[in-house]
Design a protein with these regions (language model features):
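Folded extracytoplasmic luminal domains of secretory or organellar precursors
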Residues: 2-253
Length: 253
């Protein structure tokens, strides 16, 4: 397992201090929404998706997942966030005496503007399209759609933050995943052993890219999550890295 260290460059010390001051807890209030499901009990249709995670079993997310409507998806920045969801106000379809579920956002539920009044994922509606396994944990399968309440909760992850390298020498893409606590990444900086820190561009989901050629250099990352907490991973990836490889840090948020 690759190691990460907290040797913070002076230029970034101020940034870290500001981020620490801006840290705030996740909102514990419950909010109204609706939920449906897609796929089957094995989760075949829930794999891949608009967050870039690929095989959700391999990446550690399993079937405890959901797609988000436009109002919640935030153009992919919300990928990786965790939600606690409970079925409410429907005695016919809500299962009784069951605990709320906790799911991770791994996909996008697209709007259908040809059905402005009949598509639950159209803005401004807040909607969760759950895996079938998760939906049937809180509601009866035949319901199809149920009213729910949700709130953000910390993500519990095993191991460190993971970085998967994709693309080519002139368009390096990095998937950042297995992020604990807030779960969703707000910004990413990258540094080669022979280059300065540079911001990465949000590509899609939790995939970030840069046009800087960093082949043959050690790679360091500076990651900020949506709660404004920041961590630096110095020389996490050795200079002999290859596209398609995944590297795990020794710590997490």
């Amino acid at each position: 397992m690759a190691k990460s260290y907290s040797l913070v460059p002076l230029a970034f010390f101020t940034m870290f201090f500001v981020h620490a001051l801006a840290h705030f807890p996740l909102d514990s209030n419950w909010y109204d929404a609706h939920a449906t499901f897609y796929g089957d009990m094995q989760g075949d249709e829930t794999m891949q998706g608009a967050c870039g995670y690929g095989d959700l079993f391999q990446q550690g997310y399993g079937l405890e997942t959901t797609a988000l409507s436009t109002a919640l998806f935030n153009e992919g920045y919300r990928c990786g966030a965790c939600f606690e969801i409970k079925c409410v106000n429907d005695s016919q379809w809500c299962l009784k005496n069951v605990n709320p579920i906790i799911v991770t956002a791994t996909n996008f539920c697209p709007p259908n503007y040809s059905k402005p009044d009949g598509n639950w994922c159209n803005p401004p509606q807040k909607h969760f399209d759950l895996s079938m396994k998760m939906f049937t944990t809180i509601a009866i399968y035949q319901a199809g759609i149920v009213p729910v309440q949700y709130r953000r909760v910390p993500c519990i992850k095993s191991g460190g933050v993971r970085f998967e390298l994709r693309g080519n020498p002139y368009f390096l893409m990095v998937l950042v995943y297995n992020v604990a606590n807030a779960g969703d990444v707000l910004r990413v900086y990258i540094k080669g052993s022979n280059t300065n820190w540079a911001p990465m561009t949000h590509n899609w989901g939790q995939v970030w890219h840069t046009g800087i050629n960093l082949v043959g250099q050690d790679l360091s990352f500076w990651v900020t999550t949506s709660d404004r907490k920041a961590l630096e991973f110095v020389s996490l990836i050795p200079s002999n890295w290859q596209f398609g490889q995944t590297y795990e840090a020794s710590r997490n948020f």
